[in-house]
Amino acid sequence: ENVRDSYHATLLHTFYTTFKVNRLDMDGGIVLSDRKWHHISYSKRATLVAADEYREAEVHSAQYNSELDGPQLLEAWEGFDDQITHSIQTIFPNLVLQLTLNSLAVRFFVPRGVDKTELFWVFLGYETDTPEQEKMRVMQANLTGAAGLVALEDGCINAFVQRGTHASPDKASFIEMGGRLAESNESSRATEAAVRGFWHGYQTIMGFHE
């Protein structure tokens, strides 16, 4: 569910929020496929208009006293003509296509048992990339991956969740946010539509009834 939770990044990831890479006060949206199984969420860095919540440091992931020793990490070029600088596309059930600034990647996971999953990351470039562009893609690969400046927090929080659920194997809980609809929203990413779309697909192929 991590990659389908389109609003968690701005709340959890200090790097995204502090250095204004991907935030909810940028233009963006989320588009679901017709069957709702697949989705893409996106944001446009150039449209940032800092919201009061961020300026007043009410978002805990905003650490504005932080700075980079190598700020050139964020000196991205515009790779496409749609202004999109961050996107996550999921292909049901376990394939993800990712764009973060100029870092292009494919990731997928392989279950290794009931309590173990292996996650693979494949970083991409173009044959037409200049040496400078190739160097930038390699540098920005440090944002994600197993020990990425952004992704390391995902590994941490997922471990917390796994430990918590192991402690109560016979219990269940559910928190409903924003209704039950799974539909596209091209004005906001503060939605659980993609998560619902995934479970809609899961129910369908497993033969479960809603």
Predicted regions, residues:
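C-terminal catalytic domain of Rieske-type non-heme iron oxygenases
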Residues: 1-210
